Amino acid sequence: MNYILQTNSLTKKYKNFQALNGLTMNVPKGSIYGFVGKNGAGKTTLIRLICGLQEPTSGSFSLYGIRNDSKDIIKSRRRMGAVVETPSIYMDMTAEENLKHQYLILGLPSFDCIQELLKLVGLDNTGEKKAKNFSLGMKQRLGIAIALAGDPDFLVLDEPVNGLDPQGIVEMRELILKLNREKQITVLISSHILDELSRLA
């Protein structure tokens, strides 16, 4: 079995609070992997650790077979996209402008793929509409588009359906399945909603 992410007794403590306690898990390549737990169970902490936003207290993980204490982990992280907690969106920009900004940050040489990416997430008809005027579901989909800007093959989504109305949940579910089936992107989803995860993972 080929694994994108493997964790081994991964632990994170903050003074007297243990956010993550000895987590061992394996995310197979090509899967939609659901990571379920109540609020405060350490789901976001795990995502912050694998994204390099924090360091584990003990234990380890590997991404594409590269351990987190290797200097090459940076290269592995370039192959992943993530939406951690709330999407990183500039509210006074359009969807297209947000993506152009992300392309510049990543040093991508051309904007040629932006329209295709907007179409993929269902935001190709938003025109000059600013992100601040988007619905919550549209903002979530824009966040995913931004995470996809570097053409990753591993996507990490932190509570992607949290706060969405029923239609927004359906649209998010369809998008995640589409990314997995058509683009062969491995997806790790954290959620406290078991029913919704069971329809995906």
Residue ranges of model-derived segments:
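Helix-to-loop junction immediately C-terminal to a conserved catalytic motif
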Residues: C51
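Conserved ABC transporter NBD signature motif
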Residues: G59-D69, K75-S76
